[in-house]
Amino acid sequence: MALSTGILHAAIEAARKSTYRVKLGAVVFKGKRILSTGWNQIRSSSLKHKNYENSLHAEQSALLGLEWKKLKGCSMLVVKISRAEERLGNACPCEMCRKLMDYIGIKNVFYTNEEGEIVKLKEN
């Protein structure tokens, strides 16, 4: 699938911001216009003096702070980079993120597969 190199570059740069061993980045875009980027990260909170860590998926991170009703018809690209950043890997969105994107109205979801190719997520 041919996407703008700017969109792919933005997704890779977002993935590089992750502190996880497995680095994922996501870009919400409409046409060639990038609306938001996100990466997988740890969100921690303190509750009764106990620390709890929760992971925030790259797709969720990219959607934070955006007006969801304005995203209908937008697209998303999700990429995974290796630790050495030498190649792209499988970044197929999980079921929870797919349901969230469907609920919001994200029209097209693209991701990198095991071969590092950009593919479109098949609709159910």
Locate the predicted segments by residue.
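Short, basic/aromatic recognition patches
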Residues: 1-22
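Short beta-strand scaffold segments in enzyme catalytic cores
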Residues: 23-32, 36, 110-111
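Zn2+-dependent cytidine deaminase-like catalytic core
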Residues: 36-124
